[in-house]
Design a protein with these regions (language model features):
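Alpha4 helix (beta4-alpha4-beta5 surface) of REC/receiver domains from two-component response regulators
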Residues: 83-99
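Conserved acidic segment of CheY-like receiver
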Residues: 1-12, 16-17, 50
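C-terminal output helix
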Residues: 105-114
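Acidic, metal-coordinating helix/loop segments flanking the phosphotransfer/catalytic sites
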Residues: 31-49
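Short amphipathic alpha-helix used as the core "switch/output" element in two-component signaling
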Residues: 40, 62-73
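The feature encodes the CheY-like receiver
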Residues: 57
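Two-component/phosphorelay signaling modules centered on CheY-like receiver
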Residues: 10-30
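Acidic catalytic/metal-coordinating carboxylates
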Residues: 34, 60-63
Length: 119
């Protein structure tokens, strides 16, 4: 499984990668701090899952997810962020978004979220 993780800060990506590696060993995890570069990567490569920070520079997480799903309609996609970052998305999340994860990431929460979505 190929997982694309996108966030402004490398520390967030490292934490997410650590938890994803524990939950889904053997998955290839691609980290990117630039949403536009992540979109370019997804346009040129097959990805199975995208975790995108809601509040990013140049392009927000929802815009990135919509861009990726245009190329890969079956990709599973998750917005990540703090409760405050995600407050604008509660109750109004686009059908493009599979789910939402809040910081701090907890292995059990990630595992339950992936299982709930058939992954």
């Amino acid at each position: 499984m190929k997982i694309l993780t996108v966030a402004n800060h490398i520390a967030i990506l490292e934490e997410l990668e650590k938890e994803l590696s524990a939950v889904s060993p053997g998955s290839e995890i691609i980290r990117e701090t630039d949403a536009l570069m992540a979109g370019k990567y997804a346009f040129n490569h097959e990805v199975d899952i995208v975790f995108a920070e809601a509040d990013m520079k140049r392009m927000n997480g929802l815009q990135l997810i919509q861009f990726v799903r245009h190329k890969h309609p079956d990709v599973k996609s998750f917005l990540i962020g703090t409760d405050e970052d995600l407050s604008g998305f509660w109750g109004g999340v686009s059908e493009d978004v599979t789910g939402i994860l809040t910081y701090p990431f907890i292995k059990k929460t990630i595992r339950d979220t992936l299982r709930k979505n058939g992954l």
